Amino acid sequence: MKIALIAHDRKKQDMIQLTTAYKDILKKHELFATGTTGLKITEATGLPVVRFQSGPLGGDQQIGALIAKNDIDLVIFLRDPLTAQPHEPDVSALIRLSDVYAIPLATNMGTAEILIRSVEEGAFEFRNIVHGRDRDA
């Protein structure tokens, strides 16, 4: 699966903890992230991450473009709900696109853990259908 990882500044440490805790699951998948988040994940875990611009510089939009092409299967976006974000319209657009294309989306640690564990259990087989992959092939 192709998994997007995004975290606002005050949630980056949470993302590090999440990716460290679930490194063995995440290493089996393609990871994508906004700039600083991706760098911090790689530094902390050694996981390879395709990095885009930082969120305020267009990284959220770059990931949104992949969602619009159905090239992302799951999004973990640890948002800071208590701090105004200068790129809030980009954040809203990314969440909207996830809904439009039925991309599983977590915006907090509890849901992120459930989604990652579900990935390991094969709970997102519908994404294989979206991509035209036959799991028995």
Curated annotation (Swiss-Prot):
Keyword terms of this UniProt record: Lyase
SMART domains (UniProt xref): MGS
Domain named MGS-like: residues: 1-137
Family annotation (InterPro entries): Methylgl_synth, Methylglyoxal_synth_AS, MGS-like_dom, MGS-like_dom_sf
GO biological process: methylglyoxal biosynthetic process
Active site: D60 (proton donor/acceptor)
Bridged cysteine pairs (disulfide): none
Keyword Lyase: yes
SUPFAM superfamilies, per the entry: Methylglyoxal synthase-like
GO CC terms, sorted: cytosol
Chain positions recorded as substrate binding sites: H8, K12, T34, G35, T36, T37, S54, G55, H87
Keyword set includes Lyase: yes
Matches recorded under NCBIfam families: MGSA, PRK05234.1
Family: Belongs to the methylglyoxal synthase family.
Protein's UniProt name: Methylglyoxal synthase
Protein's gene: mgsA
